[in-house]
Design a protein with these regions (language model features):
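Structural/interface elements that position substrates and couple domains in central-metabolism enzymes
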Residues: 1-187
Length: 187
Protein backbone atom coordinates (compact mmCIF):
# COMPACT_ATOMS: atom_id res chain seq x y z
CA UNK A 1 0.00 0.00 0.00
CA UNK A 2 0.99 3.55 -0.64
CA UNK A 3 0.72 5.34 2.70
CA UNK A 4 -1.62 7.86 1.03
CA UNK A 5 -4.14 5.03 0.64
CA UNK A 6 -3.57 3.36 4.01
CA UNK A 7 -7.28 3.65 4.79
CA UNK A 8 -7.91 1.00 2.11
CA UNK A 9 -6.39 -1.55 4.47
CA UNK A 10 -9.88 -1.95 5.89
CA UNK A 11 -10.85 -3.59 2.56
CA UNK A 12 -8.30 -6.38 3.07
CA UNK A 13 -9.05 -9.69 4.75
CA UNK A 14 -5.37 -10.55 5.22
CA UNK A 15 -2.58 -8.08 5.96
CA UNK A 16 1.01 -9.32 5.69
CA UNK A 17 3.64 -7.17 7.37
CA UNK A 18 7.22 -7.73 6.28
CA UNK A 19 9.36 -4.74 7.18
CA UNK A 20 13.09 -4.51 7.87
CA UNK A 21 14.33 -5.06 11.40
CA UNK A 22 17.99 -4.04 11.22
CA UNK A 23 20.26 -3.90 14.23
CA UNK A 24 21.13 -0.60 15.87
CA UNK A 25 24.73 0.34 16.63
CA UNK A 26 24.31 -1.17 20.10
CA UNK A 27 23.19 -4.43 18.38
CA UNK A 28 19.62 -4.19 19.69
CA UNK A 29 16.87 -4.71 17.09
CA UNK A 30 15.40 -1.63 15.46
CA UNK A 31 11.65 -2.13 15.86
CA UNK A 32 10.52 1.37 14.95
CA UNK A 33 9.26 0.34 11.48
CA UNK A 34 6.99 -2.28 13.04
CA UNK A 35 5.88 0.02 15.84
CA UNK A 36 5.04 2.79 13.37
CA UNK A 37 3.07 0.57 11.00
CA UNK A 38 0.85 -0.95 13.69
CA UNK A 39 0.20 2.50 15.12
CA UNK A 40 -0.63 3.77 11.63
CA UNK A 41 -2.98 0.97 10.58
CA UNK A 42 -4.81 0.14 13.83
CA UNK A 43 -7.50 2.75 13.32
CA UNK A 44 -8.35 1.25 9.92
CA UNK A 45 -8.53 -2.36 11.07
CA UNK A 46 -11.87 -4.14 11.45
CA UNK A 47 -13.15 -7.36 12.93
CA UNK A 48 -12.46 -10.66 11.12
CA UNK A 49 -9.21 -9.45 9.55
CA UNK A 50 -5.94 -11.30 9.96
CA UNK A 51 -2.47 -9.81 10.36
CA UNK A 52 0.53 -12.02 9.65
CA UNK A 53 4.00 -10.81 10.57
CA UNK A 54 6.82 -12.02 8.28
CA UNK A 55 9.61 -9.76 9.56
CA UNK A 56 12.56 -11.29 11.39
CA UNK A 57 11.97 -10.52 15.05
CA UNK A 58 13.14 -11.74 18.45
CA UNK A 59 10.95 -14.15 20.46
CA UNK A 60 7.93 -12.39 21.99
CA UNK A 61 8.25 -9.38 19.66
CA UNK A 62 4.93 -10.17 17.96
CA UNK A 63 3.29 -10.14 21.38
CA UNK A 64 5.05 -6.97 22.54
CA UNK A 65 4.67 -4.93 19.37
CA UNK A 66 1.43 -6.18 17.82
CA UNK A 67 -0.67 -8.27 20.17
CA UNK A 68 -0.53 -5.83 23.08
CA UNK A 69 -1.80 -3.03 20.83
CA UNK A 70 -4.37 -5.09 18.90
CA UNK A 71 -5.88 -6.68 22.02
CA UNK A 72 -7.02 -3.23 23.15
CA UNK A 73 -9.35 -3.11 20.14
CA UNK A 74 -10.01 -6.78 19.34
CA UNK A 75 -10.43 -10.17 20.95
CA UNK A 76 -7.50 -12.03 19.34
CA UNK A 77 -8.61 -15.44 18.15
CA UNK A 78 -12.31 -14.58 18.40
CA UNK A 79 -12.92 -11.57 16.16
CA UNK A 80 -9.40 -10.81 14.90
CA UNK A 81 -6.54 -13.12 13.96
CA UNK A 82 -2.82 -12.72 14.54
CA UNK A 83 -0.08 -14.90 13.13
CA UNK A 84 3.63 -15.05 12.52
CA UNK A 85 5.15 -16.73 9.48
CA UNK A 86 8.79 -15.83 8.84
CA UNK A 87 9.84 -15.15 5.29
CA UNK A 88 12.22 -17.84 4.11
CA UNK A 89 13.40 -16.53 0.77
CA UNK A 90 16.79 -17.82 -0.24
CA UNK A 91 19.04 -14.91 -1.25
CA UNK A 92 19.48 -14.88 -5.01
CA UNK A 93 16.52 -17.23 -5.55
CA UNK A 94 14.24 -15.69 -8.14
CA UNK A 95 12.21 -18.63 -9.42
CA UNK A 96 8.71 -18.54 -7.94
CA UNK A 97 8.26 -22.27 -8.48
CA UNK A 98 11.18 -22.94 -6.16
CA UNK A 99 9.84 -20.41 -3.66
CA UNK A 100 6.50 -22.20 -3.48
CA UNK A 101 8.36 -25.45 -2.71
CA UNK A 102 9.91 -24.03 0.46
CA UNK A 103 8.13 -25.26 3.58
CA UNK A 104 6.27 -22.31 5.06
CA UNK A 105 6.32 -22.06 8.84
CA UNK A 106 3.04 -20.78 10.26
CA UNK A 107 1.93 -19.90 13.75
CA UNK A 108 -0.78 -17.96 15.49
CA UNK A 109 -1.75 -16.69 18.90
CA UNK A 110 -4.64 -19.15 19.27
CA UNK A 111 -5.64 -22.43 17.62
CA UNK A 112 -8.13 -20.51 15.47
CA UNK A 113 -5.38 -18.07 14.45
CA UNK A 114 -3.05 -20.97 13.53
CA UNK A 115 -5.84 -22.59 11.50
CA UNK A 116 -6.53 -19.38 9.56
CA UNK A 117 -2.85 -18.67 8.86
CA UNK A 118 -2.40 -22.29 7.77
CA UNK A 119 -5.38 -22.15 5.39
CA UNK A 120 -4.13 -18.90 3.87
CA UNK A 121 -0.59 -20.11 3.15
CA UNK A 122 -1.72 -23.51 1.86
CA UNK A 123 -3.09 -21.60 -1.14
CA UNK A 124 0.47 -20.48 -1.98
CA UNK A 125 2.87 -23.12 -0.65
CA UNK A 126 2.96 -26.87 -1.23
CA UNK A 127 4.28 -27.51 2.26
CA UNK A 128 3.16 -25.78 5.44
CA UNK A 129 4.43 -26.59 8.93
CA UNK A 130 2.35 -25.48 11.91
CA UNK A 131 4.43 -24.32 14.86
CA UNK A 132 2.82 -24.71 18.28
CA UNK A 133 3.38 -21.05 19.15
CA UNK A 134 4.38 -17.76 17.65
CA UNK A 135 7.49 -17.76 19.83
CA UNK A 136 8.64 -21.11 18.41
CA UNK A 137 8.33 -19.70 14.87
CA UNK A 138 10.12 -16.47 15.87
CA UNK A 139 13.00 -18.38 17.45
CA UNK A 140 13.20 -20.81 14.53
CA UNK A 141 13.86 -17.91 12.15
CA UNK A 142 16.68 -16.66 14.39
CA UNK A 143 18.09 -20.18 14.63
CA UNK A 144 18.06 -20.55 10.84
CA UNK A 145 19.73 -17.17 10.33
CA UNK A 146 22.37 -17.96 12.96
CA UNK A 147 23.08 -21.36 11.42
CA UNK A 148 23.58 -19.76 8.03
CA UNK A 149 25.77 -16.93 9.37
CA UNK A 150 28.00 -19.27 11.37
CA UNK A 151 28.49 -21.59 8.40
CA UNK A 152 29.22 -18.76 5.99
CA UNK A 153 31.78 -17.45 8.49
CA UNK A 154 33.32 -20.92 8.73
CA UNK A 155 33.46 -21.23 4.94
CA UNK A 156 35.17 -17.83 4.70
CA UNK A 157 37.77 -18.82 7.30
CA UNK A 158 38.42 -22.14 5.55
CA UNK A 159 38.86 -20.26 2.26
CA UNK A 160 41.47 -17.98 3.84
CA UNK A 161 43.32 -20.97 5.27
CA UNK A 162 43.19 -22.85 1.96
CA UNK A 163 44.54 -19.78 0.15
CA UNK A 164 47.53 -19.66 2.53
CA UNK A 165 48.15 -23.37 1.95
CA UNK A 166 47.64 -23.17 -1.84
CA UNK A 167 44.66 -25.55 -1.71
CA UNK A 168 41.54 -25.05 -3.83
CA UNK A 169 38.61 -24.57 -1.42
CA UNK A 170 36.09 -25.59 -4.08
CA UNK A 171 37.83 -28.95 -4.46
CA UNK A 172 37.72 -29.36 -0.67
CA UNK A 173 34.00 -28.57 -0.60
CA UNK A 174 33.34 -30.95 -3.49
CA UNK A 175 35.16 -33.74 -1.63
CA UNK A 176 33.35 -32.96 1.64
CA UNK A 177 29.99 -33.15 -0.15
CA UNK A 178 30.56 -36.88 -0.69
CA UNK A 179 29.70 -37.43 2.99
CA UNK A 180 25.96 -38.20 2.97
CA UNK A 181 25.27 -36.64 6.39
CA UNK A 182 26.56 -33.87 8.63
CA UNK A 183 27.83 -31.59 5.87
CA UNK A 184 26.14 -28.89 3.86
CA UNK A 185 28.19 -26.71 1.51
CA UNK A 186 28.33 -22.96 2.01
CA UNK A 187 30.01 -20.74 -0.56
Amino acid sequence: FDLKNINKISDCDVIIICLPTPLKKNLNPENSYLEKIIKLITKFLREEQMIIIESTVYPYATKEIFENKLSKKFNIGKNFYLGFSPERVSPGQHELTKYSNITKLVSGRTKKCIKNVDLFYKKIFKYVYKCQSIEIAEFTKLYENSYRAVNIGLANQMKRLCDKMNINIFDVIKAAETKPFGFKPFY
